[in-house]
Amino acid sequence: MNERYELNKNLAQMLKGGVIMDVTTPEEAIIAEKAGAVAVMALERVPADIRARGGVARMSDPKIIKEIKAAVSIPVMAKVRIGHFVEAQILEALGIDFIDESEVLTPADEMYHINKWDFKVPFVCGAKNLGEALRRIAEGASMIRTKGEAGTGNVVEAVRHMRMINAEIKRLTTLGEEELMAAAKELQAPYDLVKYVAQHGKLPVVNFAAGGIATPADAALMMQLGADGVFVGSGIFKSQNPEKMAAAIVKAVTYYDKPEILAEVSEGLGEAMTGIDIRQLEEKDLYATRGW
């Protein structure tokens, strides 16, 4: 089991420094691959449309996932509802490369997340703080991403979550060994993982940024804040020029600390997605609060 998990962590590590894009058709997947995406997330609807449509959001139709898998040579991910291990079993049977247990879909279980040790396929999970990240890793997640607030085109929550996780990691590195057990209790996370973070100053898995990334500048901001890579959902195919936006975001992630290049790739992209002011959302419309 541990060998398998090490392999899964290494698979996630290979995506480091890259962009993972949400796609809803084989054509979009091809655009993403051409633009330099390291993986695609196969969906029926991007988060902005899920948000607009309302109702219950579930796993995508296997037909869509198969068509997208057939169209590209890069890894394909797909989302399942929090706690819905049968949706995960179906995705594993389809030969998906990564499963995202995602708060963007309507949670199926409000008490338990999926026990990811039951699966061979690697999982990615969202987190808004260190305790949440470590609980997901304890359940077998091979990759963490900020939750942000998907489908809003507003990066503020992703920034908040990344800063929060970084600050909590930094704090652990300053604690003496005798204080770590109390920290584990406070974080509601296993002691061995808390100890690992305290010793290494980082999570034991890669930590990507997600939720509200809409422009090359947003992507570079998350990288400068310490993200290992970025997920871009609605931001690409809800923009005026998806091909150009996709290529620009990939470049921005590669050259995140080179303002001259960022200025160049940000030019003439057309309108970014309209976006939503998060303060206008009601509590029930917030995705980041789903899961624990």
Curated annotation (Swiss-Prot):
Coiled-coil ranges per UniProt: none
Biological process per Gene Ontology, one example term: pyridoxal phosphate biosynthetic process
Catalytic activity from the UniProt record: aldehydo-D-ribose 5-phosphate + D-glyceraldehyde 3-phosphate + L-glutamine = pyridoxal 5'-phosphate + L-glutamate + phosphate + 3 H2O + H(+)
Lyase among keywords: yes
Protein origin, superkingdom: Bacteria
UniProt: D-glyceraldehyde 3-phosphate binding residues: R163
Pathway: Cofactor biosynthesis; pyridoxal 5'-phosphate biosynthesis
Keywords, comma-separated and alphabetical: Lyase, Pyridoxal phosphate, Schiff base
Binding site for D-ribose 5-phosphate: D22, G151, G212, G233, S234
Single GO MF annotation: pyridoxal 5'-phosphate synthase (glutamine hydrolysing) activity
Residues forming the catalytic site: K79 (schiff-base intermediate with d-ribose 5-phosphate)
Signal sequence residues: none
EC number from the UniProt entry: 4.3.3.6
Family annotation (CDD domains): pdxS
Pfam families in alphabetical order: SOR_SNZ (PF01680)
InterPro entries for this protein: Aldolase_TIM, PdxS/SNZ, PdxS/SNZ_N, RibuloseP-bd_barrel
Subunit structure: In the presence of PdxT, forms a dodecamer of heterodimers.
HAMAP family, per the entry: PdxS (MF_01824)
Protein function: Catalyzes the formation of pyridoxal 5'-phosphate from ribose 5-phosphate (RBP), glyceraldehyde 3-phosphate (G3P) and ammonia. The ammonia is provided by the PdxT subunit. Can also use ribulose 5-phosphate and dihydroxyacetone phosphate as substrates, resulting from enzyme-catalyzed isomerization of RBP and G3P, respectively.
Recorded family membership: Belongs to the PdxS/SNZ family.
Protein name: Pyridoxal 5'-phosphate synthase subunit PdxS
Species annotation: Caldanaerobacter subterraneus subsp. tengcongensis (strain DSM 15242 / JCM 11007 / NBRC 100824 / MB4) (Thermoanaerobacter tengcongensis)
